[in-house]
UniProtKB/Swiss-Prot annotation:
Keywords: Calcium, Disulfide bond, EGF-like domain, Extracellular matrix, Glycoprotein, Repeat, Secreted, Signal. The gene is Fbln1. InterPro entries: Anaphylatoxin/fibulin (IPR000020), cEGF (IPR026823), EGF-like_Ca-bd_dom (IPR001881), EGF-like_dom (IPR000742), EGF-type_Asp/Asn_hydroxyl_site (IPR000152), EGF_Ca-bd_CS (IPR018097), Fibulin-1 (IPR017048), Fibulin_C (IPR055088). The lineage of its organism: Eukaryota, Metazoa, Chordata, Craniata, Vertebrata. The keyword Isomerase does not apply. This is Fibulin-1.
Amino acid sequence: MERPVPSRLVPLPLLLLSSLSLLAARANADISMEACCTDGNQMANQHRDCSLPYTSESKECRMVQEQCCHNQLEELHCATGINLASEPEGCASLHSYNSSLETIFIKRCCHCCMLGKASLARDQTCEPIVMISYQCGLVFRACCVKARENSDFVQGNGADLQDPAKIPDEEDQEDPYLNDRCRGGGPCKQQCRDTGDEVICSCFVGYQLQSDGVSCEDINECITGSHNCRLGESCINTVGSFRCQRDSSCGTGYELTEDNNCKDIDECETGIHNCPPDFICQNTLGSFRCRPKLQCKSGFIQDALGNCIDINECLSISAPCPVGQTCINTEGSYTCQKNVPNCGRGYHLNEEGTRCVDVDECSPPAEPCGKGHHCLNSPGSFRCECKAGFYFDGISRTCVDINECQRYPGRLCGHKCENTPGSFHCSCSAGFRLSVDGRSCEDVNECLNSPCSQECANVYGSYQCYCRRGYQLSDVDGVTCEDIDECALPTGGHICSYRCINIPGSFQCSCPSSGYRLAPNGRNCQDIDECVTGIHNCSINETCFNIQGSFRCLSFECPENYRRSADTFRQEKTDTVRCIKSCRPNDEACVRDPVHTVSHTVISLPTFREFTRPEEIIFLRAVTPLYPANQADIIFDITEGNLRDSFDIIKRYEDGMTVGVVRQVRPIVGPFYAVLKLEMNYVLGGVVSHRNVVNVHIFVSEYWF
């Protein structure tokens, strides 16, 4: 059998196999909803929690499990509320429940049951008032009737109470709650659930069911180890629960809080201190202090013991005495005494007359050392020295300037040294500036002044301009950046697949106005498949075939005595139509005709910009299992449409198959359209046994992409 393979075709058997696999998977996923509901009921009965993860792989089954679990959980909570209504404490014991949702359902049914019993106690009818809900009305009526029967269900029906978990069925009644063997609490001490087959008793949190299946006993969490007391705390069991108590006391001055922590006792606020009336209570951590209320005279202050002690004003007050006087502390006060200093040579009294200060002999306008010297003051005296940058000449007896630049060459300044009277001055070369130390030179960052039109790079003693991508530095000034015309470069013709447009610093590629769009890389043009996107205008009797940059609406009809093959049904928009010979009965001419199949296929080719070797464009594969290799031969031929011998066909053998390869051997400049007629002749003994005809519709685009 042979078939042209022009493009990516999915084999039909694979498609059928995938469909059968999907149908098989769907059949296996059919799960009983009743089994899903049973799983939800079991989760409610066993765990009393519907938030646990559901294990079914079916989404619908998980939804049924969740709904049945919540419905069963509400019935269990309602039965618990009815049972509580029969307890001595009634609905008041609901504070022991932890779940707020559970408490809501239990409380609702407990109250509705209490209303039914109260209605009977007031000699009223057991029909509920219309304002309450339907479910509350059922509980109201059941508890009212139960109270009227005076517990006949538990004691008067002769049922065996040795196994309270299973109770015989009662007569069906119209009211579902009258038919419920758990109404009024049933045989259970705490929680009751009627499954239809049996009555199951259960207990509240903190209790466990006894061996009789009816009674509940407290769980000692302290013995079972199910408590959560911390290290340093002791577990104390309570009815239905437990509490944690510290092992050691908090100590004097502290009390134990409800959360088992130690808190300081404010003895002053609680009034449990023992301070005398003349003292004030001051609270401290773990204790308190008593401070006296005694008032001391002026000049005295209370100490920690409440005694009055003298205040040393000379130490506690800033400058208690006027300038020139000394402070002397006394009992309860202080006195000021005038100072009389005696200054020696080189000292004199300050302006306030309080102390002796040094006489500055070097202070202008006095020049005791003469010109060129430096006067140095000292306590009580002075001395003469040469100024910095000068040295004393013993011959001339004068101070002479030191040329530091000559004496210390290359060691004083980083770049240039210039001598000055008594000192020196450092300077720097171009591109540098003097550092804060006045000697070193540091590089000047010329880029801070933006000398370049785009980017600036500072270098040691200078700077360098450079440009961003798409620009180049001007050869004229070395500062300005000029745009690079990428489209005009020698390689510009290969930058874009269609058209290059230069823009400042870059370029843009464009595609033909129709049939193409720009690829994500911004350079290549991609063909738009109008047949896939649905933007073609083919009629219902035509088939859309995508070609490079456009599309064609074609209609292929099979010749007389031929029918379209089922495997060419164009559901997947394939590019091949195959017609198989189908002769009418007794049509000998049709039977003798060697042509067995007539096929039409469509391919689209670009205009090759560079054509250096033949391009293989289509493959015809044939299998000849009925003919031995030494007797049968397959001859491929191009019979029509080969304009200027632009195409040829060669034969090769691959994987036990004979392959006819159609090649383009000459360049064709589009737009161009031709129909290439190919023949596959099966030759046996020099005679063509049968022939297959393939019509290849070739569309050559005007573009190379």
